[in-house]
Amino acid sequence: MSGDARKTAEGLAHLTGFGNEHASEAVPGALPEGRNSPQRAPLGLYAEQLSGSAFTEPRAHNRRSWLYRIRPSAAHPPFTRADNGAIRTAPFTETAPDPNRLRWNPLPEPPAGTDFVGGLWTLGGNGDATQRTGMAVHLYHANSSMDRVFSDADGELLIVPERGGLLLRTEFGLLHAEPGQVALVPRGVRFRVDLLDESARGYVCENYGAPFQLPDLGPIGANGLAAARDFKAPVAAYEDVEGPVEVVNKFCGNLWTATYDHSPLDVVAWHGNHVPYTYDLRRFNVLGTISYDHPDPSIFTVLTSPSDTPGLAGVDFVVFAPRWLVGEDTFRPPYFHRNVMSEYMGLIEGAYDAKAAGFVPGGGSLHNMMSAHGPDRETFDRASAAELRPQKIDDGLAFMFETRWPVTATAQAARAEHLQPAYDDVWQGLQRHFRPSD
């Protein structure tokens, strides 16, 4: 929360391009030329590969980076079990999957001294982390910067800030994410989160499955949606710190801790494509109708985690960014829907065009597969009678985690005080308008 951290965050340099083969060195000459693991790595460093995919996965899907570090990652004492806090991991068996529509207000204020990891609160998810399938929805609310380091062996983390800026100090370098931006931390990458404001709040998608990638564009063509060039990767930056550093590792659903005698954020140079990124959601190139009808929300996909069935995602990350609505003879808000996919929605700022009230920044809603949902009565009545002039939607930024499997809520989410008890009421006032004579 210091001014120094804010100044550091705002002055960062970056590499650009999602999925690129990046290379960076914090000290000239630290990156070996022409080979990955020379007999003696430059500057007395250790060469180490971090694999985000199996060695033999197809080249287009292969993720790995080579790190050149002061100490090898293997140089640490045994890990011991730590308290999981409010973090839960798939398979989710505390409650039964629920077909009811659910909506939550924002998380309550945490106790003083709560850092990013301590402020994680699991809402629910699906799949099995040990089988590398499925996902989890977490929220976070923190009021203290981390003085420990965290890594997640169970999946990659898509962090969606809603309030308060974050400075992520990773093995690859530093990244800065504000509300309206997202940060993607690959599986196994160590990092620490500094808060840039008095507190920070937001959402996290923990993806146990295939790494997120840009969606195929099909008939859209070569351009549109999220552009690869707008994703920012860090330049190398390292900590040369001797002394006790706590490292927390999430492994098969549990937290484990060890005290290193040095900082593990000691990578002086690196190259590869298994790297963290940030992305500004306002750069999303929104596509939509210029004739009639509301397009399916897949047109708003930023990133997708593919499954073994083409087009059927383990999880999609979708954003409803500022856009124009111009459809003629069209009900312009999102339509009434029953979906084979399950949808968790969150709100970063403003309002969402399908809900007049109750869906607030920091809150969220869950509509499991085949659970009917759509605009509330006020939105339906207003949109059905609206004059169809071109309309700019620029007062809100909502997103969705959409997944192929039902999302089972955790016990803490199903019983939370901030769970709205009467969410179904938003649809109860919808009137009968049927007139057979028409």
UniProtKB/Swiss-Prot annotation:
Species per Swiss-Prot/TrEMBL record: Streptomyces avermitilis (strain ATCC 31267 / DSM 46492 / JCM 5070 / NBRC 14893 / NCIMB 12804 / NRRL 8165 / MA-4680)
Protein name as annotated: Homogentisate 1,2-dioxygenase
Keyword Iron: yes
Active site: 294 (proton acceptor)
Keywords for this protein: Dioxygenase, Iron, Metal-binding, Oxidoreductase, Phenylalanine catabolism, Tyrosine catabolism
BP GO annotations: L-phenylalanine catabolic process; tyrosine catabolic process
Gene3D superfamilies hit by this protein: Jelly Rolls
Span list, region Disordered: 16-40
GO cellular component, one term: cytoplasm
Catalytic activity: homogentisate + O2 = 4-maleylacetoacetate + H(+)
Binding site for homogentisate: 352, 373
InterPro entries membership: HgmA_C (IPR046451), HgmA_N (IPR046452), Homogentis_dOase (IPR005708), Homogentis_dOase_bac (IPR022950), RmlC-like_jellyroll (IPR014710), RmlC_Cupin_sf (IPR011051)
The protein's assembly and partners: Hexamer; dimer of trimers.
EC number: 1.13.11.5
UniProt function note: Involved in the catabolism of homogentisate (2,5-dihydroxyphenylacetate or 2,5-OH-PhAc), a central intermediate in the degradation of phenylalanine and tyrosine. Catalyzes the oxidative ring cleavage of the aromatic ring of homogentisate to yield maleylacetoacetate.
Pathway: Amino-acid degradation; L-phenylalanine degradation; acetoacetate and fumarate from L-phenylalanine: step 4/6
